[in-house]
Amino acid sequence: MTELPTTVPGYNSAVAQTDSDAMRYRYTAELAGRIESTWQDNWARLQTFNVPNPVGSLAPPDGSVVPADKLFVQDMFPYPSGDGLHVGHPLGYIATDVYARYFRMTGHNVLHAMGFDAFGLPAEQYAMQTGTHPRILTEANVVNFRHQLGRLGLGHDSRRTFSTTDVEFYKWTQWIFLQIYNAWFDVAANKARPIAELIAEFDSGERRLVDGRDWATLSAGERADVIDNCRLVYRADSMVNWCPGLGTVLANEEVTADGRSDRGNFPVFRKRLRQWMMRITAYADRLLDDLDLLDWPEQVKTMQRNWIGRSSGATVLFSAILSRSDAATTEVDVEVFTTRPDTMFGVTYLVLAPEHNLVDELVATVWPDRTDPRWTYGAATPGAAVAAYRRAIVAKSDLDRQESKEKTGVFLGRYATNPATGKPVPIFVADYVLVGYGTGAVMAVPGHDPRDWDFAHKFHLPIVEVIAGSDISEAAYVGDGVLVNSGYLDGMDVATAQEAITARLESEGRGHARIEFKLRDWLFARQRYWGEPFPIIYDSDGRPHALDEAALPVELPDVPYYSPVLFDPDDADSEPSPPLAKATEWVHVELDLGDGLKPYSRDTNVMPQWAGSSWYELRYTDPHNSERLCAKENEAYWMGPRPTEHGIDDPGGVDLYVGGAEHAVLHLLYARFWHKVLYDLGHVSSREPYRRLINQGYIQAFAYTDAHGSYVPANQVFQRGDGFFCPGPDGEIEVFQEFGKIGKSLKNSVSPDEICDEYGADTLRVYEMSMGPLEASRPWATKDVVGAYRFLQRVWRLVVDERTGETRVVDTAGELDTYTLRTLHRTIAGVSQDYAALRNNTATAKLIEYTNHLTKEHRGSVPRVAVEPLVLMLAPLAPHLAEELWLRLGHTTSLANGPFPQADPAYLVDDTVEYPVQVNGKIRGRIVVAADADYDTLKTVALADDKVQQFLAGATPRKVIVVAGRLISLVI
């Protein structure tokens, strides 16, 4: 246990009220503030929440072994914005602190720390507006956040804090990038392996090139190309989301459903650029399958499953004729993925995404004879039609393209051969097909796909029935049925037909079974300044080279201008120009990569904001290690699998991770991917970063708008009758109420500092935890905070005389009365279970109920044996007050490390039991008997009950059935 100071914090300096009748030692906001400040100082000075590691700088200095019972609790760390915290932000932080404090009191070695996710676009944009360097802004914001979080009394190990912008931190972000860059995915082994092993296999002849070339005859450049194409990090000319208004590309997840940037609301355009990509798709199966191992909300698992989007089907090759002559026919295969190969006899046209890389090759120079004018987009040539169509749809989001009821498209002037029928079908481009899913080309079966039916109906294309079941002239039939109009498949059910045609395609070399995913590789470059630089340089030929690990960190240089080149938001043809390109002295370097000094240029992109948060849990385990990401012993202790505790399939990971559901896909999926690569390469022992996840709900509040829709300060609004009003420039104005988020822009934000000033931090903690289940959203109401405040005042009065400041507790020699003992131990049992299950709202309710009982039954003085357990149980919720009361009760050690009270099982069992008594199936009476009453006693008491006797009317029951502890049934 932690020794305490000899002085009593906050006690002798309590300020008397000006009202002579007021209690001098009442628990007020002022006294709460002094108590809280003093105890926070005590905890910091005495390092109360510092937790030891097995090895390294944080290991016990005396060489002792760390406790086996460990617990790693983690919050999704905050982005330190300039607005600071509002009362919605601490909800999860307080909940995890209560959880960590409870388990610390029960003897666990608890790791709970807090860092800051400090890279990102907001600081960069503010820097552009003000000329203040984003580092200065970020550091100031972090100081403010630490102050606000510090007031809440969170029991964090402050030695383990960091910001993702710290050079010592992002050195290891860059190191992880190099591990992924220098790795490849071995499909046979289903894991990542070092790229050096792949090169060795090529050198030895153990592995051959898939294109048939001889590795030994390749030039150095050709070999480098082969290897670069195998890496888990690679460059590709990919379709990206280009946002001219922000001057950068965005990941799919950073684009809204209506095709605009999530930040800034600028138009986003699909554009082909050469970008760094991470091959997350190699892990699609493992990311999907391992969800079953995780104790996560089913909603989050479903979101990840849908995002990964595994589907089974077949790849089919349609042969498109490019030219035909007497000498030869030039053809190109159009590869299509379909989940319904059984419908191939119903294919009447093909559709390619407008961005498909075959479009420019397939588009004809002239329209074929008798081309339907509706297919031409009003253009003189197919090329002109495709160009015009691409311009028309460039700003449409993927969601718009898929949900649009008005189908549009252009004929390419080419036909492809359906391998099932041997007949030609026209090839179109249309925006309802996306290049990011499957192959970016679909075989259209309008008889059995609603989107294909709409397209065929508009462009007067044939609609063929191949699944019997409905009239396809009115709408596509999407149900099950028997195959018709399908040659050798006729009469088969769907499943049988799928197997049969897939086998036929494989035998003919025109297709094969395949599993496809919606998941796309991760776009990993941003044209920004405020992010982690890439540890990549380029030679004079433009070939990338990874820096040696010894060259890390690559520090972010200071630049005079932080902005990428911004363009007209509607300029889809603009090209990105990153801010780091302006730091010419930093960009152009001379390095020796083993073949002498040569000129190189650094990569001028930066990593996305997700980079630091994809691994930060590992750094908490070993934050000062300058030699390694984290020592293996420390990672294994805090995050390694524990099959004896969690089952044989335990993947390991953080014991509890709490944060918002808005990160279900992005952050959590990326973190899982990085962690799995590190696991494959032997750097960590855990297969997953987070064993258990809980999504806290949101604290919401009312906001108010005037007649123009502008928000007005919520704290100035008052209600009169059924209306709401606030002061205006010319008197009162009516305003209109809406319910939702809390935010500065909505003018309904309440700072936790305000509540701490008015009531104290412990009151804020108790109020937020009492508002409802952690996972549920709940409305904020400042007027209700006083309820938590009064509860803490009642607890204070149980221990402290408000007039004299003396302790009211008495050391009684006798036992407590039976009812109080039973109430106490049931409270201990219930609160223990609630804390362990994060049911802090019901734990609070039980503590209030027990406090009310003591207040009512012990008006003069309270027995120590009754009040000390209350103080201990209160400690996770209101730690400052609990520490203060514990000290006033005469203890000289902190209660931060317990002991948490233990319930006596003898007081958890009822002495009596109430039985309902049925007569012929209907309850006719109730009896109360001793809990251990035997059958004969139960029968005798039931038959003697007055109400039961009325319904028996003198009859003797044929049967008396007793369901122990629940029911007595009489049958007459």
Curated annotation (Swiss-Prot):
Source species, domain of life: Bacteria
Q: What class of enzyme is it?
A: ligase
Listed binding positions for ATP are K744
Q: Which reaction does it catalyse?
A: tRNA(Leu) + L-leucine + ATP = L-leucyl-tRNA(Leu) + AMP + diphosphate
Molecular function (Gene Ontology), one example: aminoacyl-tRNA deacylase activity
Q: Does the keyword ATP-binding apply?
A: yes
Gene Ontology BP, a term: leucyl-tRNA aminoacylation
SUPFAM superfamilies this protein is in?
Anticodon-binding domain of a subclass of class I aminoacyl-tRNA synthetases (SSF47323), Nucleotidylyl transferase (SSF52374), ValRS/IleRS/LeuRS editing domain (SSF50677)
Q: Name one GO cellular component term.
A: cytosol
Stretches that traverse the bilayer: none
- Enzyme Commission number: 6.1.1.4
Record carries keyword Cell membrane: no
Q: Which UniProt keywords apply?
A: Aminoacyl-tRNA synthetase, ATP-binding, Cytoplasm, Ligase, Nucleotide-binding, Protein biosynthesis
| Chief localization | cytoplasm
Motif 'KMSKS' region in this chain: where?
741-745
User: Do you know which PANTHER family this protein is assigned to?
Assistant: LEUCINE--TRNA LIGASE, MITOCHONDRIAL, LEUCYL-TRNA SYNTHETASE
Q: What is this protein called?
A: Leucine--tRNA ligase
Q: What is the lineage of its organism?
A: Bacteria, Bacillati, Actinomycetota, Actinomycetes, Mycobacteriales
